[in-house]
Curated annotation (Swiss-Prot):
Keywords: ATP-binding, Cell shape, Cell wall biogenesis/degradation, Cytoplasm, Ligase, Magnesium, Manganese, Metal-binding, Nucleotide-binding, Peptidoglycan synthesis. It is found in: Cytoplasm. This is D-alanine--D-alanine ligase. Mg(2+) 1 binds at residues 257, 270. ATP binds at residues 134-189. It comes from Erwinia tasmaniensis (strain DSM 17950 / CFBP 7177 / CIP 109463 / NCPPB 4357 / Et1/99). Its cofactor is Mg(2+); Mn(2+). GO terms for molecular function: ATP binding; D-alanine-D-alanine ligase activity; metal ion binding.
Length: 306
């Protein structure tokens, strides 16, 4: 009897619209691969009902909180339904940029200089010591919520007078915020499928940084795959990807984002354990470069579900 697969999409996070697009593409690809797949929007369908509705596996096409942060993974573990992507712990950690950075630092892996702030510090007013630490990062800099994806809530700060507004914007989305030093780029991303490392992609955007519009809406963002790195640089990036992936305990599939600094070194940005699968998405692009069609890609990801 064929497996019945739930493609979990939509949800209630700030990335709902992107998830709906990803889920629709995944559903189409799975059906093309001959898989009995069904779209399930967990905003309207309680995940606890998946077992009683006869689903054997779950393809997680959710992004952001509630779908990518270990919450749903825990429910699926309880139901004993195999699912795509990383487990509970790795999903929770990778959703949290701050704790990902702490872990990478502890493993001796390169991350951009940063200052962590919480809401209590913000409400009390940033003291002289914190401001000195932020000033030491230089300008421009980036302000990011710790636990959001798709560049939601991120601002680039070019002048000191812009910092307060950027912090207020980031704190709309989370109680913890990162203030990061600017890295000149370019930005690279590397897909991981099981034990396979996909070719790197170089991202070139017309905007100040790779924000939500550049990721999902703009036709001016350029993607280069092959990325133009030398063989030695590609090997270095591959090894960094593997080290970052393993340090956070990731499994299944995902994407590691890095930035190159002015010193020519790679610095880790974040790991996505449920990357976008839209027409602008990067893992399908890299998989295609490696000779894998979209339907082959989603079928392979589903095979890795456990």
């Amino acid at each position: 009897m064929a497996e019945k697969v739930a493609v979990l999409l939509g949800g209630t996070s700030a990335e709902r619209d992107v998830s709906l697009l990803s889920g629709a593409a995944v559903l189409k690809g799975l059906k093309e691969a001959g898989i009995d797949a069904h779209a399930i929007d967990i905003r309207d369908f309680p995940a606890m009902r998946l077992k009683e509705e006869g689903f054997d596996k779950a393809f997680i096409a959710l992004h952001g909180r509630g779908g990518e942060d270990g919450t749903l993974q825990g429910v699926l573990e309880f139901l004993a339904i195999p699912y795509t992507g990383s487990g509970v712990m790795a999903s929770a950690i990778t959703m949290d940029k701050l704790r990902s950075k702490y872990l990478w630092q502890g493993c001796g892996l390169p991350v951009s200089p940063f200052v962590a702030l919480n809401r209590a510090q913000m409400d009390a007013g940033l003291d002289a010591q914190l401001m000195t630490s932020i000033d030491a990062l230089g300008l421009p800099l980036f302000v990011k919520p710790s636990r959001e994806g798709s560049s939601v809530g991120i601002s680039r700060v070019n002048q000191a007078s812009e910092l307060q507004a950027a912090l207020q914007e980031a704190f709309r989305f989370d109680d913890e915020v990162l203030v990061e030093a600017f890295l000149s780029g370019p930005e690279y991303t590397v897909g991981v499928i099981g034990t396979d490392i996909l070719p790197s992609i170089r991202i070139q955007t017309a905007s100040e940084f790779y924000d939500y519009d550049a990721k999902y809406l703009s036709d001016e963002t350029q993607y280069f795959c092959p990325s133009g790195l030398s063989a030695d640089q590609e090997a270095e990036l591959r090894e960094l990807t593997i080290a970052a992936w393993r340090a956070l305990g990731c499994s299944g599939w995902g994407r590691v984002d890095v930035m190159m600094g002015a010193d020519g070194q790679f610095y880790l940005l974040e790991v996505n354990t449920s990357p976008g699968m839209t027409s602008h998405s990067l893992v399908p692009m890299a998989a295609n470069q490696a000779g894998m069609s979209f339907s082959q890609l989603v079928a392979r990801i589903l095979e890795l579900a456990d």
